[in-house]
Amino acid sequence: MLNHPSQGSDDAQDEKQGDFPVIEEEKTQAVTLKDSYVSDDVANSTERYNLSPSPEDEDFEGPTEEEMQTLRHVGGKIPMRCWLIAIVELSERFSYYGLSAPFQNYMEYGPNDSPKGVLSLNSQGATGLSYFFQFWCYVTPVFGGYVADTFWGKYNTICCGTAIYIAGIFILFITSIPSVGNRDSAIGGFIAAIILIGIATGMIKANLSVLIADQLPKRKPSIKVLKSGERVIVDSNITLQNVFMFFYFMINVGSLSLMATTELEYHKGFWAAYLLPFCFFWIAVVTLIFGKKQYIQRPIGDKVIAKSFKVCWILTKNKFDFNAAKPSVHPEKNYPWNDKFVDEIKRALAACKVFIFYPIYWTQYGTMISSFITQASMMELHGIPNDFLQAFDSIALIIFIPIFEKFVYPFIRRYTPLKPITKIFFGFMFGSFAMTWAAVLQSFVYKAGPWYNEPLGHNTPNHVHVCWQIPAYVLISFSEIFASITGLEYAYSKAPASMKSFIMSIFLLTNAFGSAIGCALSPVTVDPKFTWLFTGLAVACFISGCLFWLCFRKYNDTEEEMNAMDYEEEDEFDLNPISAPKANDIEILEPMESLRSTTKY
């Protein structure tokens, strides 16, 4: 979304005539697009776009209000450059999950324990440090989002993050080699590595999901007649939903690396488990470098974060009266923004309020990479590494994301709109069901011999098969489809154009708060308290979901109104990078209700 200033008729007329500075490159006319809060330095830089009309615009037919309510909504097409960005995400998540999957064993156990480890921090210490790593990885996106939106831009921030990431993985790999050092050096290397990886993750995570969504022009809904003769509405909001489903699908393809790294940990050692992600991460580096000219890189805001905080301060002093911050209402104040910016801040604040209950959701989600692994170590593994079963969450997502996107969501949309608030509520409920299953399973573990309530104090497990954990992972995957994917979509779609990375980082910050709650709960991650841990999380997630629905269901009624703000400027332009020919755009399906094409998805 590119916002144009409403600063009088003269300026508006200039914009209509296309009075922009022209840049020659490869015999293609390009222009620099500026909004009311983009600096001149940035606007005259390399942010160039092809403003040739889109082929679809020539036959544009807008729907009536009745058609908006009655016709089926479908998505548009996804450009090839989105696939390149998705490959970067896949590579980064391959490395992240491949590294973090063995962390619990690496921290909790010693070299002579079963399962083997390195740092000997016991269950409480390992769980606490695991939650710290999650906390750190989701605090740093605030820094990454601020830097990207204010100084460097998304692409440059991502590139800087990849360099730091490589350094962190290399330190972890070197210090995990048994012949290189002892336990003390391993602890030092581990701490240094997770700090660097956390910083890098923040710089990448706050911007990559925004960058992939930036590749989609925001267009008004239009009528399309399918080959079957059915009239449907091509809705860019559905396209955005499809992109984030696809993006999350690629995350989980990458997360399957834990299947390889846990096996390497079990059979070769931790050094081998960390070498694989180090090597694989270079795919992200290569894709970023060679795909640079393909990406749309939007202008960097001119101190837009600082201006947004000034608006919020004015709102606080005036009891959140948004008119108090509008230049049209108070021209004597000479505010360095326009009314449109204030309206976008209002929408962004509404989105941030929706995120208030997410820390509880992320707390239950975090048990999957900490307490679930410890629970598995109490059970009969039958040759399976205790940290291997995390893969079933990713496998379930890879299976069910296309099913939801191709069948479930289109089926529901035939009869009623499925709005974001409703989907997030369902996500909380499935999270509660997952913790309920884990609590019941834990009670059976404690009732089984030979060790009953104290299986962690022995090297042999209780007689319960570890595969009983799989339903909990599947339920968590359902909760992610509804709550996590929709949260990403909501954070992007409700953020002002030049604050999208920062608002996305606020959403990711809720994960950090969830990890902080998990750290506070680490003292109860001991025998025989795990049953109460899972029960408490189930109740908390259920209550939070109900409160979420009661507080925010009204936003479902204003969803279309909030989304309409995005159409006001971008519908005039086709935002394709100069170097990306139209032939690179691929039609996934007609209608685009599935993201699967020539690849697995």
From Swiss-Prot:
PROSITE patterns xref list: PTR2_1, PTR2_2
Presence of keyword Transmembrane: yes
Gene Ontology MF annotations: dipeptide transmembrane transporter activity; peptide transmembrane transporter activity; tripeptide transmembrane transporter activity
Biased composition (Acidic residues): 55-66
Topological domain ranges for the Extracellular compartment: 1-150, 203-210, 288-294, 400-412, 467-494, 548-554
Matches recorded under InterPro entries: MFS_trans_sf (IPR036259), POT_fam (IPR000109), PTR2_symporter_CS (IPR018456)
Modified residues (Phosphoserine): 39, 45, 594
Membrane topology reported for the UniProt record: Multi-pass membrane protein
Cytoplasmic side stretches: 173-182, 230-267, 317-378, 430-448, 514-526, 578-601
Family: Belongs to the major facilitator superfamily. Proton-dependent oligopeptide transporter (POT/PTR) (TC 2.A.17) family.
Protein name: Peptide transporter PTR2
Species the sequence originates in: Saccharomyces cerevisiae (strain ATCC 204508 / S288c)
